[in-house]
């Protein structure tokens, strides 16, 4: 049974049902349907922590998908998997690729900021406050962009920007 049919989570089940309906009723070329099915299965595997399987599905979806907007979400999800695996440099590559195709993807900007902030925290722990400030400044820039696109989101980031004097 495909991963997309094994979900026990209500939201995952709902997504799977809606995705299957979309695949049946929305007129799409067979290649687009296959790409969407791989994307759906990748999301399902990812939600279950099956990251290797998720990546396989996402890579196959990327091979088939031609629409830049849709590709941006696949790339974003590949970035999420790499973030979950602690592979921050790889994650950043995929977030940047997603943003090249879809510059108004606030979640990619937010995750990029989170990685920059994390690297700033690491620099502090290593006794390098100058490098930390560079990372924190980069995080601030990405968060400002994300907040501009989604003003009601990223409240913790907004607070951090205000507290550190980087909001302006």
From Swiss-Prot:
Cytoplasm is among the record's keywords: no
InterPro entries on file: PSI_Ycf3_assembly (IPR022818), TPR-like_helical_dom_sf (IPR011990), TPR_rpt (IPR019734), Ycf3/AcsC/BcsC/TPR_MFPF (IPR051685)
Record keyword Thylakoid present: yes
TPR repeat spans: 35-68, 72-105, 120-153
One Gene Ontology cellular component annotation held by this UniProt entry: chloroplast thylakoid membrane
GO biological process: photosynthesis
Record localization: Plastid, Chloroplast thylakoid membrane
Entry keywords, A to Z: Chloroplast, Membrane, Photosynthesis, Plastid, Repeat, Thylakoid, TPR repeat
Top-rank lineage group of the source organism: Eukaryota
Membrane-protein topology: Peripheral membrane protein
Function: Essential for the assembly of the photosystem I (PSI) complex. May act as a chaperone-like factor to guide the assembly of the PSI subunits.
PANTHER family: CELLULOSE SYNTHASE OPERON PROTEIN C (PTHR44943), TPR REPEAT-CONTAINING PROTEIN MJ0263 (PTHR44943:SF8)
Family, similarity comment: Belongs to the Ycf3 family.
Protein name listed in UniProt: Photosystem I assembly protein Ycf3
UniProt organism field: Gnetum parvifolium
């Amino acid at each position: 049974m495909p991963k997309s049919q094994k979900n026990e989570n209500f939201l995952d089940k709902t997504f799977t049902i809606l995705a299957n309906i979309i695949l049946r009723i929305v007129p799409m070329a067979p290649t687009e349907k296959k790409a969407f099915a791989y994307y759906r299965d990748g999301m399902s595997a990812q939600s279950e922590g099956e990251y290797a399987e998720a990546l396989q599905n996402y890579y196959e979806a990327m091979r088939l998908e031609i629409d830049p907007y849709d590709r941006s979400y696949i790339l974003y999800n590949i970035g999420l998997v790499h973030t979950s695996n602690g592979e921050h440099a790889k994650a950043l590559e995929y977030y940047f690729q997603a943003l090249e195709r879809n510059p108004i993807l606030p979640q990619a900007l937010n995750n990029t900021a989170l990685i920059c902030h994390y690297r700033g925290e690491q620099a502090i722990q290593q006794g390098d406050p100058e490098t930390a400030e560079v990372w924190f400044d980069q995080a601030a820039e990405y968060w400002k962009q994300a907040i501009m696109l989604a003003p009601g989101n990223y409240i913790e980031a907004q607070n951090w920007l205000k507290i550190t004097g980087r909001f302006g």
